[in-house]
Amino acid sequence: MRRLGIPKNQTRIKDKENDFYSTDPQAVFDLLRYEKFQHHITEPSCGNGNIAEVLKHEGYQVDAFDIADRGYGYQKDFFSCKDELEGDVIMNPPYAFAREHIVHALQYMKDDSKLCALLKIQFLESLKRRDLFEKYPLTHMYVFRRRANVYQNDNRSLGISNVCYCWFVWVKGYKGEPTIRWVD
């Protein structure tokens, strides 16, 4: 069985700088229509703050940080967090290290805490993620009927994405099959 490992820090920083896709705030508002969260939320790949700002606007207390300084939150390597995470986790992780972000969050979350990650639908594919889904079964998946916009390096001039993004939701300790829901 493949080890649920973490890549070396310098590689993560270099790749993270080139793997930044900001989240359209509407995708967060859409998630909040379907999911309720604990008052405290950790956002470990906050980028320019689009997710965190929506959550704060909706009354949540947000701990927002990122491995790269993008002018929002504070700079911190999520993999250096070794204490139990408070509350739920919502993130749009760098795709190259999405699996590692998810595993790390689930390892340090309290039971029954929720993790939501905005990812390409293709994240379901791949033998290298099989162990993730077996050890930590998905609870829900929210598939956007219309494309959710993400912006490479926050460049909105590139227009609408042609990639299908989904909210992947885990509840730590959940055992069972996931539900798939569509977001209008």
Language-model-detected regions and their locations in the chain:
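Class I S-adenosyl-L-methionine-dependent methyltransferase catalytic core
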Residues: 1-184
